[in-house]
């Protein structure tokens, strides 16, 4: 072999495997194309948008990222009607190479039902993994357009936005003495199930053949195939994008023809929304008809029973919180129904742990308490946190009393409440696999720092390079907050 041929052979890149994929480079390549799509959308160059979408959906990086998204989300091990799962790295890599538009035909969805908090069942339609990956691939090409065209005060299913942003916007709208005294709580009847296919196919800037195939795939239930003539499946990865595109423009519709003195403001999270107004008559006679007309064009309608107009002094619920004014002071507190749901979960978890170790119980209980506290930490939740801590303490005392019915209270306190070195903290000492001694303590909700959330800018677009430093700064700030929460002395595994 010559030196030249030897050099050529050594420069041949190794075969691609799932573990050797340079994921930062893959994400960078996809984001670069997405930013070009967003720029073309802003300029109204729709032919260029279509061309860039084609490039993105046929790129290897986007296909790899689509499969990565499908195989890392919570439903990765839930199969569709074909009962296929991607367990190995080779299967994942082959799945990415198999994402091709030519000859593609989606399989029907698998219909299952999941319980809702009110006891009813919610239908969930599950695509196959291959169909999920195809949807994830085309969602990468649709997301920059949806983000560019989105309403300023839409916060659900959008990159860089969350429930806390929506609630903070509500606070800004309602906290002042001169803020609107009336609120319309909007509820869309079966939003995901009733969106008009005709409207989506006419207005959504996506490959029409692919979109039509997904919308009309049908679903299997009890060995019977049912057609789908309306709606977008709640189990589909592209469904939240389609729902947002259908509902964007609602903010402009409710504000059309209003004046500053009408105090009409709008906030939406997915299909939940609120509209403020200076008078009940304004919301009833002007805003509500505008909403009805807007939704009718999309095959949707308001739920007359659940769409109500409420004075802010009475309060209303939004995203698991109760927003109510006491005099001139607006408070955002955890909704009573959500507190009760948490109490029920705590009770069932502790009851089911009678035969488990203290450490096993804490490893189940702490993530539940910490997650709930972090969600409600931006409102007036301190009093609720304290009451819940006492509730947990009572349930745990009953749990240990049942385990040791003949032991004294002093003995129980020494065994179960002394390892952390703090009086009254439910804790246990354990050893790691390396033999190191550690203490696992109950997470105290009252130790959670209450702080105002810094709302995202209404015009911020993660696919616009002008906002790249802005979102990077917000990301770093969020990690600092999470880090402080995660390393609180109570509830974490810490050295003794």
Ranges and model annotations:
Residues 297-372:
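A conserved non-catalytic segment of reverse transcriptases
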Residues 16-75, 140-156:
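Charged boundary/loop elements
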Residues 105-117, 212-227, 363-366:
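Active-site-adjacent bridging/hinge elements
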Residues 123, 227-232, 331, 347-361, ...:
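Short, solvent-exposed helix-loop connector elements
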Residues 98, 102, 149-153, 157-161, ...:
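Conserved polymerase palm-domain catalytic core
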Residues 50-121:
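Phosphate/adenylate-binding "loop-and-lid" substructures adjacent to NTP/NAD/dNTP-binding pockets
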Residues 393-395, 400-495:
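Extended C-terminal regions of large enzymes
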């Amino acid at each position: 072999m010559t030196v030249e041929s030897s050099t050529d052979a050594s420069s041949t890149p190794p075969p691609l495997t799932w573990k050797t994929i340079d994921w930062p480079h893959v994400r960078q390549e996809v984001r670069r194309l997405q930013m070009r799509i967003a720029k073309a959308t802003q300029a109204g160059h729709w032919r260029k948008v279509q061309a860039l979408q084609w490039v993105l959906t046929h790129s290897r990086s986007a296909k790899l990222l689509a499969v990565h998204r499908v195989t890392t989300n919570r439903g990765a091990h839930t199969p569709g009607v074909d009962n296929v799962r991607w367990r190995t790295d080779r299967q994942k890599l082959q799945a990415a190479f198999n994402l091709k538009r030519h000859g593609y035909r989606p399989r029907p969805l698998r219909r299952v039902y999941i319980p809702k908090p009110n006891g009813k069942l919610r239908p969930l339609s599950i695509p196959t993994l291959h169909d999920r990956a195809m949807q994830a691939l085309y969602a990468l090409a649709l997301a920059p357009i949806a983000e560019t065209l989105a309403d300023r005060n839409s916060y659900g299913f959008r990159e860089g936005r969350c429930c806390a942003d929506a609630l903070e916007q509500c606070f800004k709208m309602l906290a002042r003495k001169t803020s609107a005294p009336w609120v319309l709580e909007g509820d869309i009847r079966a939003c995901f199930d009733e969106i008009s296919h005709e409207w989506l196919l006419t207005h959504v800037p996506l490959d029409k053949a692919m979109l039509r195939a997904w919308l009309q795939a049908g679903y299997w239930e009890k060995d019977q195939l049912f057609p789908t003539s309306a709606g977008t499946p709640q189990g589909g990865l592209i469904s939240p994008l389609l729902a947002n595109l259908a509902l964007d423009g609602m903010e402009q519709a409710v504000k059309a023809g209003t004046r500053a003195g009408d105090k009409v403001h709008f906030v939406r999270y997915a299909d939940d929304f609120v509209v403020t107004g200076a008078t009940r008559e304004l919301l009833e006679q002007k805003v509500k008809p505008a909403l009805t007309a807007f939704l009718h064009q999309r095959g949707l309608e308001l739920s007359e029973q659940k769409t109500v107009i409420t004075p802010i002094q009475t309060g209303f619920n939004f995203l698991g919180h109760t927003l109510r004014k006491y005099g001139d002071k607006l408070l955002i507190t955890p909704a009573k129904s959500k507190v009760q749901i948490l109490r029920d979960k705590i009770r069932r978890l502790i009851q089911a742990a009678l035969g488990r170790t203290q450490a096993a119980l804490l490893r189940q209980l702490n993530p539940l308490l910490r997650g709930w506290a972090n969600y409600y930490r931006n409102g007036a939740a301190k009093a609720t946190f304290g009451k819940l801590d006492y509730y947990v303490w009572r349930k745990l005392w009953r749990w240990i009393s049942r385990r040791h019915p003949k032991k004294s209270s002093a003995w129980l306190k020494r065994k179960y409440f002394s390892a952390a070195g703090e009086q009254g903290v439910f804790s246990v000492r354990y050893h790691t696999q390396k033999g190191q001694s550690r203490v696992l303590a109950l997470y105290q909700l009252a130790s959670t720092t209450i702080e105002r959330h810094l709302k995202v800018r209404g015009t911020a677009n993660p696919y616009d390079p002008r906002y790249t430093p802005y979102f990077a700064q917000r990301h770093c700030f969020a990690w600092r907050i999470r880090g402080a929460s995660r390393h609180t002395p109570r509830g974490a595994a810490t050295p003794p």
